[in-house]
Design a protein with these regions (language model features):
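Acidic-and-aromatic substrate-binding clefts and catalytic sites of carbohydrate-active enzymes
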Residues: 70-76, 98-106, 128-132, 160-166, ...
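Conserved, mostly hydrophobic/aromatic
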Residues: 26, 58, 81, 112, ...
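Active-site gating/metal-coordination segments in enzymes
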Residues: 2-6, 10, 75-163, 215-220
Length: 295
């Protein structure tokens, strides 16, 4: 049964003002289970997190542009997300879908593009352990999805554990379209920024093509330190290296962490990583506007 989302942000206020046209580039909505049934790959007990609750929080932070991301709980059924999108002005909303590329029709894809879809998610559980052959088995589907994205001007949105990002690196270097990588690439923060996986990731992101954008999201999924202090070196390395290829997202409603982590607290971390307002302007406004086509 869905549970009500508590408010870990109670008593907190933003430590900096969001710039005009700020974008939350990664969040989810969940509706009543009776109306929006969950798929077979249920990794967590989904909280009930309707758009109305999210918008209250977004209003406190100053976000006026929104990128919905299809959660794994709904599989290929994007209807909960689309219904929520219909409540917003099309000019301020975009979306990342999940889909069965073997069944998607040209008409369906064109309709989704008109509704604001700009990417397709490649989603492997962040806690999945190294598995021989997994990365190779993913390549045919990624190629099919990339062909769809290339035709429509979309990008691929990768959420995979860090070990899998590294195994996919040869493919990512040659991917003929733009792509995003969620949650800093999910490299364990305890291993530091000098770990070979993250150094290889930095090299990929900074290859000069500007194909790869990194989402400064989900830090509670790879950090074990109090206050997520061990994430700061990762954030600053990315901000110093590729400031024009970073976007920020709340990852609301934080799913299995929803009773422990608050969005305002996470937003305030960005102020610590990027004390320069010009850097935050890029991360919250300029970069997502370029990537998602906000006017």
């Amino acid at each position: 049964m869905a549970t009500t989302v508590p408010d870990p942000d109670a008593g907190l206020e933003p430590t900096f003002a969001a710039p005009p046209q700020a974008c939350d580039a990664h969040f989810h909505v969940f509706g009543p289970a009776g109306r929006y049934p969950y798929g077979s790959d249920l990794r967590y007990a989904p909280p009930q997190a309707p758009l109305s609750e999210y918008l209250k929080l977004a209003g406190r932070l100053g976000f006026v542009r929104f990128v919905f991301v299809q959660p794994s709980a709904y599989g290929f059924d994007n209807s909960c997300m689309f219904d929520a999108m219909d409540e917003l002005d099309p000019a301020v909303r975009r979306a990342i879908v999940d889909l069965d590329e073997t069944k998607a029709t040209d008409a369906q894809l064109a309709d989704w593009h008109a509704r604001g879809v700009r990417g397709i998610r490649v989603n492997i559980s962040p806690v999945r352990q190294p598995e021989a052959g997994l990365s190779q088995s993913m390549l045919p589907r990624i190629a099919r999805l990339a062909a769809i994205c290339r035709e429509l001007g979309w990008h691929l949105d990768f959420l995979t554990p860090g070990w899998l990002v590294s195994e996919l690196m040869p493919m990512l270097r040659e991917l003929p379209i733009g792509f995003t990588v969620a949650h800093f690439g999910l490299y364990p923060a305890k291993d530091g920024v000098k770990q070979p996986g993250f150094q290889g990731f930095l090299k990929l992101v900074n290859d000069g093509s500007q194909r790869c954008y990194v989402k400064l999201t989900g830090i509670y999924r790879f950090s074990l330190a109090p206050g997520f202090a061990d994430v700061t070196p990762f954030a600053r390395a990315l901000i110093q290296t590729v400031p024009d290829q970073l976007i920020w997202g709340s990852d609301y409603p934080h799913l299995s962490f929803h009773d422990k982590v608050g969005t305002i607290g996470l937003y305030n971390k960005l102020g610590e990583w990027a004390p320069d307002p010009a850097a935050r302007q890029r991360i919250l406004v300029d970069n997502p506007a370029r990537l998602f086509g906000f006017a």
